[in-house]
UniProtKB/Swiss-Prot annotation:
UniProt keyword annotation of GTP-binding present: no
Lineage of origin: Bacteria, Pseudomonadati, Pseudomonadota, Gammaproteobacteria, Enterobacterales
Keyword Ribosomal protein: yes
Family per record: Belongs to the universal ribosomal protein uL30 family.
Gene Ontology biological-process annotations: translation
SUBUNIT field: Part of the 50S ribosomal subunit.
Domain of life: Bacteria
Stretches of the chain forming a coiled coil according to its record: none
Keywords linked to the UniProt accession: Ribonucleoprotein, Ribosomal protein
Protein source organism: Erwinia tasmaniensis (strain DSM 17950 / CFBP 7177 / CIP 109463 / NCPPB 4357 / Et1/99)
Cellular component terms per the entry's GO annotation: cytosolic large ribosomal subunit
GO molecular function: structural constituent of ribosome
Protein name, UniProt field: Large ribosomal subunit protein uL30
SUPFAM superfamilies to which the protein is assigned, alphabetical: Ribosomal protein L30p/L7e
InterPro entries noted in UniProt: Ribo_uL30_ferredoxin-like_sf, Ribosomal_uL30_bac-type, Ribosomal_uL30_CS, Ribosomal_uL30_ferredoxin-like
Amino acid sequence: MAKTIKITQTRSSIGRLPKHKATLLGLGLRRINHTVEREDTPAVRGMVNAISYMVKVEE
């Protein structure tokens, strides 16, 4: 089974760059305190790094 990470949105997407909003939607995050589980891949890690100020990651 592939390793997964939990990603939680901690800040609002209102007033953010359009690319950052698109990244949130790409990860499946829709609202504050929404948590999703994603596979720990370089692509997902890159998306999380781009919006690290808006999300919390748990291994």
